[in-house]
A protein has these predicted regions:
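Short glycine-cluster motifs
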Residues: 1-34
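A contiguous loop/helix-start segment that scaffolds small-molecule binding in enzyme catalytic cores
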Residues: 25-27, 35-147
Length: 147
């Protein structure tokens, strides 16, 4: 735990998912998926219209509604990551698309507490992991051109 650093940014980062990346996503939104009245936040529909990375907290019970909104906007192929129990020994990660993530969540039995990340930045996870491994295996100092 780092005081002042939100799980909305820290947990994706621990899985090599940046919330912004030059040329991919210029901004991000953090949304509570489920309101106090146990309804889907109306901000999710607004976010589905955007090209920003969308980070949804407390949204697993509304996953079906969330994916339906993104599909209505023609975003069924947009990458999605679900990170359950991020930064703990029980962490689990599911990767898919808007169209496939419900199946992946069921297959891996992903439940709350979880963070849902929707956006093209999810596709950069593997590349960033490779770069990280390169830095860990070599004593490289300086700027990496792929970052």
């Amino acid at each position: 735990v780092v005081p002042g650093i939100s799980s909305a940014v820290a947990v994706p980062t621990l899985q090599n998912i940046p919330v912004t990346k030059r040329g991919v996503a210029e901004s991000f939104r953090v949304i509570t998926g489920t309101t106090k009245a146990h309804k889907l936040s109306t901000d999710v529909a607004l976010a589905a219209k955007s090209n920003a990375t969308v980070v949804i907290l407390m949204g697993m019970s509304k996953l079906s509604e969330i994916t339906a909104l993104f599909c209505q906007e023609g975003k069924q192929n947009v990458p999605v990551a679900i990170i359950q129990s991020g930064s703990t020994a029980n962490e689990k990660v599911g990767i898919g698309t808007v169209a496939s993530i419900e199946h992946e969540a069921k297959k891996q039995q992903l439940t709350n507490p979880a963070i849902i990340i929707i956006g093209e930045v999810v596709n950069h996870r593997q590349k960033l992991k490779e770069i990280q491994n390169e830095f860990q295996t070599k004593e490289v100092i300086g700027f990496h051109p792929d970052l």
